[in-house]
Amino acid sequence: MKPMYRSRSWRRKYVRTPGGRVVIHFERRKPKIAHCAICGRPLNGIPRGRPVEMRKLPKTKKRPERPYPHLCPKCMRRVMKEQVRAQIMKG
């Protein structure tokens, strides 16, 4: 095993070959799931992928198509309400 593969930053995947041997394939681990910028809840609609995999996806598959995609729906609604109320008070 190469010294670089001794680190646990590489995921070990055991693969059975057609000859019947079991060999280890080393893969980079997936990044953690995206979280809301305000409350920290996990975000739906954003895939867990390494930058190489994310680059291959179309823009619509990388994030939700709604205002404030970096926020969870609950926080997004709260921010939008605050903005509208601020505009009403100002104007």
Curated annotation (Swiss-Prot):
Transmembrane segments: none
One GO term (biological process): translation
InterPro entries: Ribosomal_eL34 (IPR008195), Ribosomal_eL34_C_sf (IPR038562), Ribosomal_eL34_CS (IPR018065), Ribosomal_L34e_arc-type (IPR047868)
GO molecular function: structural constituent of ribosome
Keywords: Ribonucleoprotein, Ribosomal protein
Keyword Ribonucleoprotein listed: yes
Protein name in the entry: Large ribosomal subunit protein eL34
